[in-house]
Amino acid sequence: MKRQLWSRRNFTATAAIAPFGFRTLLANAMPAASGIPVGIEMYSVRNSLAKDPMGTVREVAKAGYQGLEFYGPYYQWTADQAKEMKKLLDDLGIRCYSTHNDSGNFSAEKIGHAIEVNKILGGTYVVMASSHEGSTPDAWKSVADILNSASEKLEAAGLKAGYHNHQAEFRGDVGTRPMDILAKNTKPTVMLQLDVGTCIEAGSDPVAWIKANPGRIHSMHCKEWSPEKDKGYAVLFGEGVAPWKQLFDAAEHGGGIEYYLIEQEGSRFSEIETAQKCLAAFRATHGA
C-alpha cells in the first residue's frame, strides 16, 4: 500500500485552492532587485512542516517565497510522495532549489535514493548539511573525498553536490579552518553553501570568505545572529550584526550566487509570521 506523508484530504484541498490563488502568489513572489530568487530553508518552519507538509509549503508560497530547500526528513519520502510534493510546487509556481542531507546520504548505499527524490523534486543541489566525521585536517580531507565521489554520481544524474557550514567549520586560523580544507580539496563544482550566522558566531568574516572563493557560493543561508545576551539566533533578519549590504555585493559580484535562502531558528513570533517578517526585511535591505 502506498504510504502517504500527508492526508489525502489536506492534499486535495490545497491543490484545489492553488490555481485560484496562483496570480496572487506570483505577484507576491518577487525576486531580489538583482533578479536572484529568494527562497526559504524549510527548517525555519519545521514544526508546521511536520504537522502539515502541504499546507506549510502553501503558506510559504503565499508569503512570497519563490522557492525552498527541504531538509533531513525529506529523505524518507517515497517516489510517490515526492511526486505529490512536486505537483504542489508546480501548482504554486515555486521551486525546490536544493535539499539538506545527513552525511550518510552521500554513501554509495544511500546516494541513489537521494538522486531519485531530488530529480523528482526538480532541484539542483544535494547539500551535505554537516559532517560528524571531521575532527582533524585529515578527517576533513576524507569528507572532501566523500563529496567528490558523490558529486560524480550526482553530476551524471544532472545534479550537483554542496556542503553547508556550521560554527565548527569556521573556527581556527584562516587557511587551516575546516572550510578552507574543504574548499581546497573539493572539486570546483561542489557548492560551498554559506551559512552567514554560524560563520559570524564562529568569529570568521563571511564577506572575506565569499571573496576568497569566487564562483562557489551558489547559495547562501541568510541567517541572522546577535551577540547580545539571550538573543543569538532568535532575532529576525536585520536585527543582528550580519553586514548584509556587503554580503549581497560580494555574492553578486564574483561569489556566483544563484539563489538566497532565508533561515531562522526561532523568534518571538510564530514560524510563519517569522518567515513573513524576515522576507519583508530582506527585501527592504536588498532593495527588492
What is each model feature region?
Residues P31-A33, V57-K62, W77-C96, K110-G122, ...:
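Acidic (Asp/Glu)-rich catalytic clusters
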Residues M1-F20:
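N-terminal secretory signal peptides and thylakoid transit peptides that target proteins
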Residues I272-G287:
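C-terminal helical cap(s) of enzyme catalytic domains, especially alpha/beta-barrels
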Residues L25-K51, E59:
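C-terminal segment of N-terminal export signals and the immediately downstream linker at the start
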Residues I40, V60, L68, L89, ...:
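Conserved, mostly hydrophobic/aromatic
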Residues A15-A16, G67, Y74, D91-M191, ...:
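Active-site acidic/histidine proton-transfer and metal-coordination neighborhood
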Residues G67, E155-V241:
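Acidic/histidine-rich catalytic cores of soluble enzymes
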Residues V45-K51, Y71-Q81, D102-K110, E133-K141, ...:
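Acidic-and-aromatic substrate-binding clefts and catalytic sites of carbohydrate-active enzymes
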